[in-house]
Each structure stands twice: as C-alpha cells, then as structure tokens.
From Swiss-Prot:
Enzyme superclass (EC): hydrolase
SUPFAM superfamilies according to UniProt: (Trans)glycosidases, Beta-galactosidase LacA, domain 3, Galactose-binding domain-like, Glycosyl hydrolase domain
Protein family: Belongs to the glycosyl hydrolase 35 family.
Function description: Cleaves beta-linked terminal galactosyl residues from gangliosides, glycoproteins, and glycosaminoglycans.
Its EC number(s): 3.2.1.23
Signal peptide positions on this chain: 1-27
Organism: Pyrenophora tritici-repentis (strain Pt-1C-BFP)
Localisation per UniProt entry: Secreted
The keyword Cytoplasm belongs to this UniProt entry's keyword annotation: no
Gene this protein is translated from: lacB
One of the Pfam families matching this protein, by short name: BetaGal_dom3
GO molecular function: beta-galactosidase activity
Coiled-coil zones: none
Protein name: Probable beta-galactosidase B
Keyword Nucleotide-binding: no
Amino acid sequence: MKTIAGLSWISALSSLASLPNGLGVSAQNNTPSTWPLHDNGLSDVVQWDHYSFKVNGKRLFVFSGEIHYWRIPVYEVWEDLLEKIKAAGFTAFAFYGNWAYHSANNKTLDFESGAHDFSKLFEIAHRVGLYVITRPGPYVNAEANAGGFPLWLTTGAYGKLRDDDPRYLQALDPYFSKFSELTSKHLVTNGGNALVYQIENEYGEQWKDRTKKIPNDAAGRYMQALEDSARANGIEIPLIHNDPNMNTKSWSKDYAPGAVGNVDVAGLDSYPSCWSCNLAECTGTNGKYVAYQVVNYYDHFKEVSPTQPSFFPEFQGGSYNPWGGPEGGCPGDIGADFANLFYRNLISQRVTAVSLYMMFGGTNWGAIAAPVTATSYDYSSPISENREIGAKFYETKNLAMFTRVADDLTVTDRLGSSSSYTTNPAVTASELRNPITKAAFYVTIHSVSSSSTTESFKLHISTSVGNLTIPQHSGSIVLNGHQSKIISTDFAMGNKTLTYSTAEILTYALIDSSPVVVLSTDVGGSVEFHVKGATKGSLASSGFTSNATFRAEAGGVTTNIERVTGMGVYQFNNGVKVVLADKPTAYLFWAPNLSNDPFAPVDQSVLIQGPYLVRGAALDGDVVALKGDVKNSTTIEVFAHETALTLSWNGKKLETSRTPYGSLKAQISAFNGTIPLPSLNDWKVNEGLPEKMPEYDDNGAAWVVANHTTTPNPTKPDTLPVLYVDEYGFHNSFHLFRGYFEGSATGAQLSVQGGLAFGWSAWLNGDLVGSWLGNTTLGVGNMTLSFANATVHANGTNVLLIAQDNTGHDLRGGATDPRGILRATLDGADFTSWKIAGEAGGENIQLDPVRGPLAEGGLTAERLGWHLSGFSDCDWASASPSTGFSGADIKFYRTTFPLDIPEDVDASFAFILNATGPKTVRVQLFVNGYQYARFNPYVGNEVKFPIPPGILNYAGDNVIGLSVWAQGNDGAKVDVEFVQEYAVESSWSSRFDSEYLRPEWTEERLAYA
C-alpha cells in the first residue's frame, strides 16, 4: 500500500498536528465533551448536543419521512406505509395533525371514528420499530384546506389567528390539549416511540426586526402558550420547531438565549428545488431556479443553533402539483438523482437529523386540499400515491441504510471542503471526521453541483494506515452526472475495520459476530477497498466480468475489481465478508432487523438480496421467516446466522440451499394470476341540480336564510346581506345560493370568491346566464351577467341560482379570506332575499362522523346520500356519462361493481377520467361515499386518480358516483375507465375487512332535499 506524506493538497489541514494510530491529520479541537449535552429538564431519555440526538444514551441518526394519516384515511394502509419506510432503513417517520379533520364545530372533537384515531400510528410504529416526530399544529400548512385549521375558525370571529389573541387561544385549546394528551401515552420516555413534539409550523415570527433582534412579543407569547399546553398535557419529550427558511432565525435558544417561546431544538425547512411544480412560486425564497444547485446550510446552523443538532424537520422529498401542473406531477428534477445528490449533500454539511417531506403524499380526497393543489398529493414522493416504490425510493433507501449503521457519522467535525481533496478540480470533497474514533467520511460532488458531466478522479484521504490517494492501484472514482458519493475511511464493523472503499457502503451486519459489509457502485465501475487486519482474501462468488486482485499491504488486504456487474462475495481470513453489488443489485438489497428497536442493532440484522421489497424477518428455530413483496419470480439470497438452515417467504417454506460462503439461496415466485376488472357499463342517472328551477322548494332543512347584515370577517362584503358560506355553517366544496327578486331586471354583477381554479355558474329561472370557468391564478371570479336570453318574470318572483365550486380556504393569513359572494347587484331591480345550502346538516349535525367533516359538499347528490351504498337508485333512468347530456346542468351518475382480490396480494387500482366532449366541465368521482377525484379539465391536467384499498372494497361491491357539471350549454361527455396499477404477491394483503370505513345511507338524508 502506498502512502503519501505531507498532504500539501489539503490546505485546510496543513497546520493540524498528527494524530495517534498513524493518522496524518487531526480533527479540530472540538470534542463531544466540548459541547454541552442538553436535555429538557424533564427527562434525560432524549438528549442532544452539537452533533446529534441521543436516545437512552446512544447517538441516533434521525432519517425520517412524512406521511399524513388524514390523506390516507385507512389505518390498515398505514401499516403498509410504515413497513416500507422501515424497510428503507429509516429510523423515524413524521406526521402532521389536522385540526379540521377532527373538529366539525367548536364544540366537537373526534379522535375515535375510523381513521381519526391517529394513536394507531404509534402502535404500528412500535410494532415496526420507528421513532415518531409528532407535529400537531395547530396550524400545519401542508397545502391543506385553511392550512389544517377547522373551517369554523375561518369566519373572523376568533380574532387574529396564529397569535396570542385570547379568542384564538381559547378555540385551539381543546384540540391541542387532547392531541398532546393522546400523544403523551406513546412517549419514548415511557416506552413508546414518540421522539420529539413540534410546536406550530414554519412560524418564523419571533422578530419584529431580526437584524436588531427586536422581538415580536405576541408571537413569543403564542409559542409559549402552546409549549405550556403541551407540557401540561403530558408531553415530556423535546419540543422542536421548523423555521420556514434561513432568513427568519426563530425560536432557537442559541440564537436568542432566554427569549419567550424558544423551543428545545430548533430546525430548518428547505426545498432547494421548489416545493411546487410551478417554479415561480419559490423564486422569492430560493432565488432563480437552477436544477441540482445545492445550498449552503452549514453556516446557518453554526450561527443559529451551534449547540444543537443540524436538523431538518422538513427537507424536500418532492413537490406538490398545482392546478394546471403536469399530469403525474413533476418528477424530472426531483427523482432518483435528486435524492442521491441532495441528501448526500446534507451529510456533507453535518446534518444528522432529517425528515423528508413527503415520503408518501397521499390524496386530497373530499375537501382536504387548499386551493393551491388539485386531488393528487403524490408529491413525487419516494412512495407514490398508489403506494408503489421505484428508483427514488431505492436511491433514498440506499443512503438511509448506510446512515443507520454508520455510528461514527453521528459525531463528526467538518475539516474542509474543496477540490483540493481530489485530483480533478471539477470534483469537490467535504471531509467529516469523528474526533473520537478518527473515522472519516468524504462526501464528493461536482464542484459546480448543477453539472451533469461524468468526472473521474482520485481522492486524497487520511487513514489509520497513513495518507493515501485512492484508488492506489487501478481505476478511479467516477461521478456519473448528477451524483454524489460518500467515501468512508476507518469504518468500524464490530471489532473489524474497513480502512477505505472507493465504492459506497450500503450496510453491514454482524453475522455470528463476524461482519458482512455490502458495498455498492455503478454498473461497470471499478472498485478498490482495504480490509484492515486481514492477510488473505478470496473470491467466493462473482457475477463480475473481471476477477479480483488481492494485495497484502499496510496491515491488511487491498482488493481491486476492474469491472462490477451484478454481485460478488469476497472472504477474508480475519472473518470479514464483503458483498459488492452494482446499483441495480443494491437497490434490491435489504437489511431487516430481528428486533423492533429503531436503532436496528447490527447483530440482529439479516441481509437479503433479490425481492422487490422485504418488510421483515424473524428466526423461527432454524428457519429464517421473511415477509415482503415480489413483483417477478427471483432468486433470493440471505446472509443469516449459521444456525439458520431454511428460508420461508410469507409463511411458505422454500427449497433452500447453502452457498460455499455461508449464505442461503432459494427461488421465490411472483403472483402470476389475473385480476378480472369490471366493465363500467351499467350506469344510472338522475338530475343533480333541481335547485335551478324556480319552482324548487327551498324551505327544507338543507337551506339557511342568509340575513346577516354584519360580519366578523376582516374582509367586508360590498353588498348585503352577507353571503359568506362559513358565516352560515357551510364550508366544503359545493355551495348553492338562491337570490330572489321581484319584477324586471336586465342583468347582474357578481363577484364570487372560491379559491384558485374554482368555478361558478348562474341560472335565472332555470336558464343559464353565465359561468366562471376557473383560472389557476385567480381566486375571485367577477362577471357581468345579461338576462337577455333568460326568462324574466316581470310581474312575479324570479330566482337567480349560483352554484359555486369552492376549492378550499387559503393558507396562512389567507385562512379567513371568505368563500361565497362578495358583491351581488341587479340592473333594474334589487334582491329581496337570499338562501344558502351546503353540506347536509352544516357544521352542527354530523351525519357521517367516520368519513368526517371534510368528506362532503352541498350537491343535491351529496346531501341526499346518492354516493353511499344502501341508497336505492331503482327508479333512476339508465344512462352513461360517456353518452353525456346537452345543456348547462349537473347530472349524477351511479353504478356498482364487485371486486374479488386474492388474499396475499397487494393490488392498486385507479380511475381514469376523460372529457370526450367540451372541457368546460367540473366532475367529482365518489367511491363508496368518498370523493376521490376532482376532474376539472379546463383548469387542470390530472386524469388518473388512484383509490386505496379500504376505500375500495376488495372483497365485495363498490358504489361509484359521478357528478358531472356542464358549465356551458353544449353539455358534457365523460369517459370513466377503471385500471389496475400493479399487483404483487405480498405479506401485506390489500384485502381486509374495511366495512367500518363505509357507513351506509340512512333515511335522515331525506330531510336535505
């Protein structure tokens, strides 16, 4: 082995003294003892310092990802998601609460019905083995309706929101207290898995003037009130917060010692490639968009939170797709390459706690969404909306698996970052070194991070056997396009050491006390690694096109492989086993743990290659019992304890053989059956807008007289009465306004507000007089209507009906922006009265607590329950939405079909909608009572709508409803297709008893005609 003395090419290290054990450079003077070790004064179970979090005295690399239980309201599916997150090597997951989902009115909280019982997340987390980052709000943003505020809060009657206004604090107290109380039963301090608890969300309001550090006292009192409430309701774990960007610098005890409202650990949110597919939304925060341009966070954390871990409660996991965005989202610059480059870049900046937003996005079903986004909340996440995993998941997994076993990564100092570490100025490396063990991690990246060139280089490193330039003997390290690589040195594997490897470390396990380490590199790449303490090495198995060369040198064995394809196994006489895999092979490498410890102890891990997904492993005598998913029949190879003789897969024993190097092999078969899909032919139809006719009777329970002449809303209407729907207890989606006037009028002026992409139509005495078709950049639709082509009763009563499609309440300070009519005037007459209808029962009567307060709007079909099973459509006419109808109207179509999905299969299905007639239509798709699609082709491009199991009945009948609103007189035609997304043989069966999620129609609906 060649060594190089006097590393003149690392100027940052030139003045550092020699270290023990032959290391040529020293870490900076900082050591863990230099930095204060913090706890919150209530418990020392969770501690933290400059380097990382500690749990029960052990340092933890927090690799987490966000899911939203309220965007996937089926708790059986939560287990599928958390098993996938665990399988990806994560140590934690995060979730937001949603106050609106739990609170229909200011007297009601529901944490029990259906998926409202979020405590099941903690139970699954404990079983699977994940810590939990709990984020209750009360405001969460999340592109959710009103940012997660309950919609009854948006009227203005509760004062200034997100402030210390006593009306607001009193309103939030029941929710926040109960959420804290329920979480307190699952804290890591009492044997649960809740690790930290977030106060508010992206509330960077600590300063009136940050440069002068003039505090915003009201914001401080608000934060302190939330913190006091959390503590009073049993939250003993650390309190955290997430700054929205690097400018606000709020709530850190390091930055503002002693300030009111500070939290225990301050974090930062960042979306360097934009949180939206519309890049223009981010230029104000991020500046001009440059694909793959990384951001300097290192200096921010040094300034704002130097005695705390560098922590991202949110780091970009994808982007949401706004109205008008591309079908399927925008994965182009935020796919697998993004995950590779940006997440390793965080490592280079000493980040030891990160949660990806989102890991699984889910769906904006019902009225979940804010106006900024449509039905899909796929977010281009590692786990797709239909729960499928692919390259981005695998790329993220490969890094997370490494961080879970790289104990030395939790205590590092950054010694330098420059191109001087490499032999190619186009490549920069950052050196992180553990000041105790002297292990190091060199994170390599293009010097211009946005570069997509292929660059070969060698790397100057400092190790326990001297200063080296690697690879020493042949080949080079290569960055292929948008790529970063972490080169580890003096990597501890139990009591053995991998001195260095030019391939990345994927994971390792101690099998019968001996390390098996898995390395990964690009297909066709060359690799060099040095195993310390060995004197001989041998090739045990190889699918490679070139053989290995072994050299005994410098207290170990250096191994060179010229070209890597597939997987090879190398054995060394000190007990170390090295598995070398190319990237596609490494994508299908797994390390399930035999315990449910989130730390995943390496002596209880099993290493597995082959399947699409491995969800878990257990030892049952001499059987390694594996569970997971398989897409294609494949060979499975397992590195497990020598007492294991046989493999089983999803409960079935496999014909197993042992390789000469000790692993177990078997064949597993995939699901090769077919799932017959129903034809959607037998539709029935009914009139969906009887309210447009003047003879319609609006004296029933569905209607409220709109007679308010004042409003607490800060936005005052231009005309009276007040026609804001929230004033009258209606909040969701579809609303109706009936305005009466006597005698002649020639037209009307209307200003209607409903959020971005919303629409409205107006009928006079049953005749269409105008439609606002929607605009992706406007939340207000102003129109002058002419009555020239309508029937006006000059000597009688006239009725103007306005149907409004509300796309949700705005975010942040816009939550109180009203929904409804801002101005309504007539030419030649005056309105004499108004009535408003919305969801059946309004906010005060909950007809469907299981689906919850955001499930329905005010369509006739919704109020009367036509979308529910148990409703009889026997007297409806037969007609298909693909045939359609003429004229401006709303029709409701209904059909039923069965599904019979096999046991032990995870299958996913979606509906595809296509407007074959005019695009000026607004369509809602209902599946077993859940609105799971808003299809608005005039303003949006989304056409495919995945439906999760549980919402779909996989073992029986499914009721499908389709509301079709033609906004023009040329009518509408809509094709509906039901497709299979995938079907895999799985230990997690998508067929389960979900009847509890689908309460049926009841007669009380009849009152809301």
